[in-house]
Swiss-Prot record:
Sites of S-(dipyrrolylmethanemethyl)cysteine modification: 239
Molecular function via GO: hydroxymethylbilane synthase activity
Function: Tetrapolymerization of the monopyrrole PBG into the hydroxymethylbilane pre-uroporphyrinogen in several discrete steps.
Note accompanying the cofactor annotation: Binds 1 dipyrromethane group covalently.
Protein's name according to its UniProt entry: Porphobilinogen deaminase
Catalytic activity reported: 4 porphobilinogen + H2O = hydroxymethylbilane + 4 NH4(+)
Keyword field contains Metal-binding: no
Cofactor(s) listed: dipyrromethane
Species name: Orientia tsutsugamushi (strain Boryong) (Rickettsia tsutsugamushi)
This protein's UniProt keywords: Porphyrin biosynthesis, Transferase
Self-association state and partner proteins as the record states: Monomer.
Length: 298
């Protein structure tokens, strides 16, 4: 039996898809192959995502292939997966999560606070932008689209003073993160919802594929992302809303989660920490979002 695995065609996406293929082949004894698919998000590099349709542009063509049965599963970076999926599709599994953090990539500074006054920092993420400006209002934030390789090369070529990249992506691409790279503490920058996790999407009614996905699902990662996605779904924020969060296991079937919600124009910035049992994680994430909504409408 051949399992057709749909993926974006970028180097990082294909590495992540290969990790899923390896799980399918090794654990299930099946033959999985990768079908690379060009997405709109990959093709349009000169505009902010929120001006052209959001992160869903990295999924649109892949999900179309899934709905039309030209692939059997789709592999995504979970942080790119919107709160709500097209009818007929659902998240079927996640692999064990990688590093959840963001890294400051800069030749001239090891920490955000060490950047010179008015330093130019490239990012297209509104989440990263607002957290950078909360810490350093003097920074000059400029649009910085492109895959990891493109953004890394812009640092090498001194086009900007710094950028921020997901640690998991750099590690999966085998970058030497001892050069120019330093983890940003969560006290300064919370990651995107789902950051570091590789997600598998499938057709809800596929009675063959769904059980296979369950067999390679990493249960603890799955439970923790329910907390984060409960928060995300309740806010139903698009990619022009600065939103972040991370749920971490703390033992005894319990988790701790940190959430942030901001405004692009810096009119407000909310932060909260919650704890609870994993079996109640989704509902606790929902409640955290509702508490922010209440503060907005007081």
């Amino acid at each position: 039996m051949i399992i057709r695995v749909g993926s974006r065609a970028s180097r990082l996406a294909l590495i992540q898809a290969q990790a899923v293929v390896q799980k399918i082949n090794d654990l299930l004894g099946l033959n999985a192959i990768i079908i690379p698919i060009k997405t709109t998000g990959d093709l349009i590099q000169n505009k902010n995502l929120y001006d052209i349709g959001g992160k869903g542009l990295f999924l649109k063509e892949i999900e179309y292939a899934l709905l039309n049965n030209t692939i059997d599963i789709a592999v995504h970076s979970l942080k790119d997966v919107p709160a709500y999926l097209p009818d007929g599709l659902q998240l079927a599994a996640v692999l064990e999560r990688g590093d959840v953090g963001d890294m400051l990539v800069s030749k001239i500074a090891n920490k955000i606070t060490d950047l010179p006054l008015g330093a130019i920092v490239g990012t297209s993420s509104v989440r990263r932008r607002i957290q950078l400006l909360m810490l350093r209002p003097d920074l000059n934030i400029v649009l910085f689209r492109g895959n990891v390789d493109t953004r890394w090369n812009k640092i090498i070529n001194n086009e900007v003073d710094a950028t921020v990249l997901a640690a998991a992506g750099l590690q999966r691409l085998n970058y030497d993160t001892s050069r120019f790279c330093n983890i940003i503490p969560q006290s300064e920058m919370l990651p995107a919802i789902g950051q570091g996790a590789i997600a598998i999407e499938a057709r809800k009614d596929d009675k063959l594929i769904m059980p296979l996905c369950a067999k390679i699902n990493h249960q603890l990662t799955w439970q923790l992302i329910q907390v984060e996605r409960g928060y995300l779904k309740t806010l139903n924020a698009d990619c022009n809303v600065p939103i972040g969060g991370i749920a971490s296991y703390i033992g005894n079937n319990s988790f701790e989660a940190k959430f942030m919600l901001g405004d692009y124009n810096m009119r407000y910035f909310f932060y909260s920490e919650v704890r609870g049992k994993l079996q109640h994680g989704y509902d606790i994430g929902v409640e955290a979002a509702k508490n922010f909504q209440k503060r907005l409408f007081i």
